[in-house]
Amino acid sequence: MRLPLSHSPEHVEMALLSNILAAYSFVSENPERAALYFVSGVCIGLVLTLAALVIRISCHTDCRRRPGKKFLQDRESSSDSSDSEDGSEDTVSDLSVRRHRRFERTLNKNVFTSAEELERAQRLEERERIIREIWMNGQPEVPGTRSLNRYY
């Protein structure tokens, strides 16, 4: 079976070479126009990338918010149906109280589980402070009124 002339490997290679030579001749004849097309293509690519990032970030934050809102709405509807005699509950203040309690728990939680870890952390802080002092004291002072020449 013989391939048609338009799809033979020699014809494909010649078409590629012909296209490369045509592009080179266009660039050599119109360098400003070629530069304009190149810069325009780069700018369009950057704008499309930025748009994709913005859309991805906004969709990502929206997807994170929705399950929480849906959960709260389901909870409100179930509490309204079960507690119709008690009245409506203020979920905003309830959430703020929970956040405040969670914050207090993190403040009261001991980060270091043992005295050895606490001692290591204190030694590390002291070492960092000493290194910082050495670094600050080791820097040469360059006052504006003094000459840089050491030999007067």
UniProtKB/Swiss-Prot annotation:
Source organism: Homo sapiens
GO CC entries: endoplasmic reticulum lumen; endoplasmic reticulum membrane; intracellular membrane-bounded organelle; lysosomal membrane; plasma membrane
Keyword annotations of the record: Apoptosis, Autophagy, Endoplasmic reticulum, Lysosome, Membrane, Phosphoprotein, Transmembrane, Transmembrane helix
Modified residues (Phosphoserine): S114
Homology family: Belongs to the EVA1 family.
Pfam families: FAM176 (PF14851)
Positions where Phosphothreonine occurs in the chain: T106
Region (Necessary for the localization and biological activity): 1-60
Function (record text): Acts as a regulator of programmed cell death, mediating both autophagy and apoptosis.
Membrane topology reported for the UniProt record: Single-pass membrane protein
Tissue: Expressed in lung, kidney, liver, pancreas, placenta, but not in heart and skeletal muscle.
Transmembrane intervals: 35-55
Key word Transmembrane helix present: yes
InterPro entries: EVA1_A/B, EVA1_dom
Region spans: Disordered: 70-97
Location of the protein in the cell: Endoplasmic reticulum membrane; Lysosome membrane
PANTHER family named in the record: PROTEIN EVA-1 HOMOLOG A (PTHR48422:SF1), PROTEIN EVA-1 HOMOLOG B-RELATED (PTHR48422)
Record bears the keyword Membrane: yes
Domain of life: Eukaryota
GO terms classed as biological process: apoptotic process; autophagy; cardiac left ventricle morphogenesis; connective tissue replacement; energy reserve metabolic process; lung development; post-embryonic development; TOR signaling
Protein's recorded name: Protein eva-1 homolog A
Compositionally skewed regions (Acidic residues) per UniProt: 82-92
